[in-house]
Amino acid sequence: LDEMKISASTVNDLINFEMQLHIDLCNEYGISKTDLESTDEQNENIAYTRYVLELGYSGDFLDLLSALAPCVLGYGEIGLNLKDFKPDNVMYQKWIETYASNEYQDVCKNVSQLIDNSFLIRLGNNYKDTYKWVQANKIFNKATLLEVDFWNMALK
């Protein structure tokens, strides 16, 4: 039940707060919600999202957590690293403040705790010595590379 509560809370935060942040930022720069919704999906986005979805369909909960973690935790890490950076152009300041915020950092802590507890519950105290842990790390690393490609779309 605890896993379901944390998962539901995280999904709620992502859909109702994080997505709205991105919609609002785009709107500030002249990109409407309609424009966003009608934009053709790029290959990098397809590769990343389908990888995560496929693991959700064919893998187990640990696989899915391993694939989702780079996104949730990566944004938090980037936000923290940029927290004290004051760009000349404030275009991304709201984004930085959101992902560096205590609220988003709490989301990251909750997700990290969910991951640790989920492995512990399913695989025991020595879960880091299991084949499943090795596989989870491979999934995490692959998802991280796909996340990097996703970010690099902006540079095209």
Predicted features by range, described:
Residues 1-4, 130:
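Structural helix-adjacent loops and short alpha-helical linkers that scaffold large soluble proteins
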Residues 5-107, 145:
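Active-site-proximal alpha-helical scaffolds that flank and shape metal-associated catalytic sites
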Residues 26, 76, 115-119, 151:
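Hydrophobic residues within well-ordered, non-membrane alpha-helices that form the packing/core
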Residues 52-54, 121-130:
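Short, charged/polar, low-complexity loop and linker segments
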Residues 108-123:
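Short loop-to-alpha-helix "cap/lid" segments that border enzyme active sites
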Residues 130, 134-156:
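Acidic, carboxylate-rich catalytic segments that either coordinate divalent cations
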